[in-house]
Amino acid sequence: MKAAVLTLAVLFLTGSQARHFWQQDEPPQTPWDRVKDLATVYVDVLKDSGRDYVSQFEGSALGKQLNLKLLDNWDSMTSTFSKLREQLGPVTQEFWDNLEKETEGLRQEMSKDLEEVKAKVQPYLDDFQKKWQEEMELYRQKVEPLRAELQEGARQKLHELHEKLSPLGEEMRDRARAHVDALRTHLAPYTDELRQRLAARLEALKENGGARLAEYHAKASEHLSTLSEKAKPALEDLRQGLLPVLESFKVSFLSALEEYTKKLNTQ
């Protein structure tokens, strides 16, 4: 179990290099930057959509009758959560920095393996790209006369044009499939090599580095404990910030319920 957790952590901390394996080099982005970006997008979308729903409810007949002032409470809650996110930012950043530092050696070894395999398969990728561009240019040359013919003709030629294009499309599909199959065949040994290298790294870590693995686990647990302790004040601030909001909602709801009950009794 420890090995599995460590594997996931290391793969994540390598900068998701496997995801970019077939891509060109991109500007480096730290794991914390990726997590922060995803969390920010998710929270912003949730906040905006939630506020829209609250606004729609308050604008309805029932919302106006209850007069719960949900929109004011929603703004207060989102402000409180934004404050919490700002307070936890440095603490979480410190956690990721410590974890990256502890796994630096292992990440460098795995990055080296990825780069070596990438260098071996790059000629096949370049050749595939070149052939694909050639096929697209050949297809364009074959289709161009038909396009000109369509412009000169009328609608009655559409069916005839479709019959002429169908074989070309099938030919293009078959040729593309052949190139993809050839690329897959060329890359298969290197994919297996990369898989075997990764398995060997993890096996060596498990067999010969038991103490090292235990050390990783102990340090990760220590960092998590530190993160938990440092987050307590911010979470307490969140609780204190939400209490007035919840109390205000409770008072507004009970007041609206009492008023509604009185109206029912007078009818």
Swiss-Prot record:
Tissue-level expression: Major protein of plasma HDL, also found in chylomicrons.
Entry comment on modification after translation: Glycosylated. Palmitoylated.
Top-level division of the source organism's lineage: Eukaryota
Stretch forming the signal peptide: 1-18
GO CC annotation terms, alphabetical: chylomicron; endocytic vesicle; extracellular vesicle; low-density lipoprotein particle; spherical high-density lipoprotein particle; very-low-density lipoprotein particle
Entries under Pfam families matching the protein: Apolipoprotein (PF01442)
Record region (10 X approximate tandem repeats): 68-267
Keywords of this entry: Cholesterol metabolism, Glycoprotein, HDL, Lipid metabolism, Lipid transport, Lipoprotein, Oxidation, Palmitate, Repeat, Secreted, Signal, Steroid metabolism, Sterol metabolism, Transport
GO biological process, one term: regulation of intestinal cholesterol absorption
Subcellular location: Secreted
Positions where Methionine sulfoxide occurs in the chain: M110, M136
Swiss-Prot/TrEMBL Sequence repeat ranges: 68-89, 90-111, 112-122, 123-144, 145-166, 167-188, 189-210, 211-232, 233-243, 244-267
Any one GO MF annotation of this record: protein homodimerization activity
Chief location of this protein within or outside the cell: secreted
Summary of subunit composition and partner proteins: Homodimer. Interacts with APOA1BP and CLU. Component of a sperm activating protein complex (SPAP), consisting of APOA1, an immunoglobulin heavy chain, an immunoglobulin light chain and albumin. Interacts with NDRG1. Interacts with SCGB3A2. Interacts with NAXE and YJEFN3.
Protein name per Swiss-Prot or TrEMBL: Apolipoprotein A-I
Native species: Pongo abelii
Gene name, Swiss-Prot/TrEMBL: APOA1
